């Protein structure tokens, strides 16, 4: 049944030329336009009166509702839907997505005529009518962004705030937050120091990176409060936003706050600046040296350290804590043995203050640097001094317990492990084992929803709309509707929703929803760890001589078993294979007639994916951790991380100190999944920690992958 459903979905994908964008693990992606093969929608929508187009008239008469919906979605994406008098008329009133058509039309009208009171009234009426539906949240959010400039120019910000207050999910949407900041900064004669610092801390946060409205806030704030400019410059440099940083630098130079020639040289050519002034660093302007030090961290960290040392006694507490925290952080993620020394120079408040771009990452990488060299006493101290919410995270709860055992306080360790031992996660399993408990969860007394509960939850309009979106390949919209539909559900209702999703072959929703329930009820193992495509996976895993449980564990993480998945970086299919990798695999397998679109075929994708896993094992010491890391980040990186080890490393320590957050989480999830799938096959392991094994930096790895 599952294979048939996926095949039907795949055919739908081809029919509508769907190209999915976004992270399938997080189930998010950018919005995209779709067209129906039977008409040239792009050409039709260029017409000032597309509704009179003969080809379109014929299409709208013959097409089914899903085809028409995809056309009007493209019209909306191209900002052309307002050219239709009443697009709703082309659909039956029972079409589940008809309100999206109406919302798009109203929003498009508001964009064309923001001062039209009738449109504003229609939108308000629509929002009242659909107050419990996600479409109202979406329209309200988009309407705010469409009208923000108009309301700001006419000083009608009370209307903006009134609409914003009614949002449930999106009050803190970066665009909305920054529009509010921009209005307040632009319309205040005097900006208090506290308000300026608060605004600066908001726009400097990573989630606001690259936001156009937030850039307007930055310019307005610097214009009103020039003293914020250098802080903003330092943050932008650390975030790698060089073009924006250069604009701020130019403002500082124009306002005579920095010497023009030296600061431009330090910013644009830091290596040249260092060569020019390395023998007279102490004579250079303090702020110019700070610019050079931050810019050099990504070019030559030793040169950056020398510049930082030249500033001893010149920096205030905030400047010192941020600069040495940055050096420690960059050193730690690059596995530099001096990282802890650099952190130490930042003092007790290292990584804190307005100049620190990534305070959370900075703090955690100090702990990872201690973990990497097994300085257990230091690690225990660092975790004990983390912010409480950070110290309670699964990884630090586990390593706090381990550190206490290693420094002779084993009796204190269980209190930390018990906080996470009920979880099916990587660290939940390690904590269970450390407590002497099984890291498997018995399914002898599992809880299931009743048929009545499943049928009842399936009548939820949001879940119905979500399913329709999934059926036509619109996963972003489907995920939003699904999350909206389950947002207020209790554990029993979530279980019913998960089983309803499973019943309708929405395995991605079944898994994600079941995860929310797993801590409350013992669930059927297959609900959390389904095994679709068994024949194909068994066949190609055996052919590649790899463990099919590993393949399932990886596929569950990569695509949640969505056959037509495409990530935001272009990885495709069940096993998320990059186009260049697919070509390389085809060449290795001597497939001369390979075409890129074949990677979406279930058999081809699994064949290629398992073959590639075999090649990674061949190259990377036949080590499951390294091969899994290599599948996500590339074999060259995995090999470099291995070879940079100062000594043989415990597998769990190696994984925790992988520099890339995505890869670190990926490896943990895939390996935890793998032993869960093995459990289904009665292939239990007695020790997760021993199963993870060790990573030997001196192990032989070949320089070329072969299948």
Residue ranges and their predicted role:
Residues 2-18:
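Bacterial N-terminal signal peptides that target proteins for export
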Residues 94, 98, 103, 132, ...:
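Catalytic glycan-binding domains that act on GlcNAc-containing polysaccharides
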Residues 60-68, 93-102, 117-119, 132-142, ...:
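Generic helix N-cap/helix-start motif at coil->alpha-helix transitions
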Residues 31-104, 111, 441-462, 471:
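N-terminal leader/linker segments that initiate helical-solenoid repeat arrays
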Residues 14-28:
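Bacterial N-terminal signal peptides
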């Amino acid at each position: 049944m599952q294979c048939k459903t996926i095949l039907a979905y795949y055919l739908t994908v081809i029919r509508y030329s769907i190209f999915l964008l976004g992270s399938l693990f997080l189930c998010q992606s950018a919005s995209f336009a779709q067209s129906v093969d039977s008409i040239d929608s792009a050409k039709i929508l260029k017409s000032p009166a597309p509704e009179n187009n003969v080809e379109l008239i014929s299409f709208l008469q013959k097409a089914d509702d899903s085809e028409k919906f995809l056309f009007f979605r493209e019209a909306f994406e191209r900002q052309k839907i307002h050219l239709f008098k009443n697009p709703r008329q082309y659909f039956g009133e029972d079409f589940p997505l008809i309100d999206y058509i109406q919302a798009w039309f109203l929003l498009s009208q508001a964009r064309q005529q923001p001062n039209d009171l009738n449109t504003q009234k229609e939108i308000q009426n629509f929002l009242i009518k659909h107050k419990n539906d996600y479409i109202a949240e979406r329209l309200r959010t988009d309407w705010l962004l469409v009208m923000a400039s108009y309301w700001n120019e006419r000083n009608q910000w009370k209307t903006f705030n009134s609409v914003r207050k009614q949002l449930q999910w999106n009050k803190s949407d970066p665009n909305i937050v920054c529009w509010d900041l921009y209005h307040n900064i632009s319309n205040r004669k005097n900006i208090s120091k506290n308000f300026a610092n608060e605004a600066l801390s908001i726009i400097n946060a990573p989630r606001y990176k690259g936001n156009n409205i937030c850039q307007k806030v930055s310019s307005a704030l610097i214009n009103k409060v020039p003293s914020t400019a250098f802080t903003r410059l330092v943050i932008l440099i650390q975030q790698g936003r060089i073009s924006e940083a250069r604009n701020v630098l130019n403002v500082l130079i124009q306002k005579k706050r920095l010497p023009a020639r030296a600061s431009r040289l330090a910013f644009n050519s830091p290596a040249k600046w260092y060569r020019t002034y390395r023998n007279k660093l102490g004579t250079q302007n303090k702020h110019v040296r700070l610019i050079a030090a931050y810019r050099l961290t990504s070019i030559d960290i030793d040169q950056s350290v020398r510049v930082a040392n030249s500033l001893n006694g010149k920096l205030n507490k905030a400047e010192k804590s941020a600069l040495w925290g940055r050096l420690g952080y960059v050193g730690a993620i690059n596995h530099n043995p001096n990282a802890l020394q650099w952190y130490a120079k930042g003092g007790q408040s290292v990584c804190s203050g307005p100049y620190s771009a990534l305070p959370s990452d900075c703090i955690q990488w100090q702990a990872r640097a201690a973990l990497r060299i097994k300085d257990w006493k230091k690690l225990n101290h660092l975790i004990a001094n983390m912010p409480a919410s950070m110290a309670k995270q699964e990884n630090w709860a586990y390593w706090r317990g381990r550190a206490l055992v290693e420094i002779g306080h084993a009796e204190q360790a269980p209190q930390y492990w018990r906080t996470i031992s009920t979880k099916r996660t990587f660290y939940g399993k390690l904590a269970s084992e450390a407590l002497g408990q099984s890291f498997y969860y018995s399914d002898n007394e599992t809880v299931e929803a009743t048929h009545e509960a499943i049928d009842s939850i399936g009548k939820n309009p949001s879940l119905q709309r979500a399913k329709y979106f999934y059926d036509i390949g619109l996963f972003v919209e489907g995920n939003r509707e699904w999350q909206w539909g389950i947002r207020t559900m209790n554990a029993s209702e979530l279980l019913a929703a998960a089983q309803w999703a499973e019943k309708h072959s929405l395995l991605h929703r079944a898994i994600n929803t079941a995860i929310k329930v797993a801590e409350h009820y013992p669930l059927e193992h297959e609900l959390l760890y389904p095994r679709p495509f068994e024949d194909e996976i068994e066949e190609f895993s055996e052919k590649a001589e790899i463990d099919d449980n590993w393949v399932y564990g990886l596929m569950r993480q990569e695509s949640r078993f969505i056959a037509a998945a495409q990530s935001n970086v272009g990885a495709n299919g069940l096993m998320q294979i990059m186009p260049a990798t697919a070509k390389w695999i085809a060449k290795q397998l001597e497939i001369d007639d390979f075409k890129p679109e074949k990677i979406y075929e279930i058999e081809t994708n699994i064949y290629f994916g398992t073959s590639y896993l075999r090649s990674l094992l061949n190259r990377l010491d036949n080590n499951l951790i390294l091969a899994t890391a290599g599948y996500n980040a590339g074999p060259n990186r995995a090999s470099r991380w291995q070879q940079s080890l100062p000594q043989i490393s415990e597998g769990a320590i190696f994984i925790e100190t992988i520099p890339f957050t995505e890869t670190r989480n990926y490896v943990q999830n895939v390996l935890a999944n793998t032993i869960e799938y093995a459990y289904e096959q009665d292939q239990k392991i007695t020790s997760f920690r021993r199963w993870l094994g060790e990573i030997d930096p001196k192990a032989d790895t070949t320089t070329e992958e072969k299948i």
